[in-house]
Amino acid sequence: MVSPREVPRPDAAPRADGPSLVAVGIDGSDTAWRALAWACGHARRAGCPVLAVYVSTSGYRDRVVPGTDATAAATTAADAAAQLLRTEVEQTAAGFGMRVGFVHRHGDPARELVTAAREHGADLLVVGTSAQLLHRVAGSLPGKLARCREMPLVVVP
C-alpha cells in the first residue's frame, strides 16, 4: 500500500489558490445581473479583477446586405446597446467596490465568451442560467459552455 505522501503530485498551477481574473457573461437579463453580482463578490474576496463580456448576436445583422445603410444601422444599434450596458455594469460593480473591464463582441455567445475570457487570461467564467424555454429545449448557453471544458464555470441561478 502506498501512503498519501508517496503519491506523486502534479506541480501546482502558479495561481492555484484562486482565480487571477473572473470573466462574466452579461446580456442585461436578471440572471446575468445576478451572475455579475456573484462574480464581483467572488473576485473581491479573491483579490482579482472582473471582466464583463457582452456578446451581441449577429442574427439581425446577417439578414441585411453588407455595406448597406441597414448593416451600419444594425451595428450602430448594437454598439449603442453595449455602451448603455457598460455603464450599468460599471455602476453595479462599483456598488461592490469593484472596477470592471468590459468587452463587446459579436457572434455566437458561447464561442465569443470563451474566446474573450481566454484572450484576457481569465481562469473562471461566470454566467446566469437561461430563462427562456427555447434555450432549455435547444440547448442553453451554460450547457454549451460546460461542454467546451475550457475553464471552470459557475452558473448562477
What is each residue range found by the language model?
Residues 67-71, 119-121, 143-144:
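Short, hinge-like loop/turn segments at secondary-structure boundaries
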Residues 51-53, 101-105, 154-156:
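General small-molecule cofactor/ligand-binding pocket signal
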Residues 124-148:
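Glycine-rich, Arg-bearing micro-motifs that act as flexible, cationic patches
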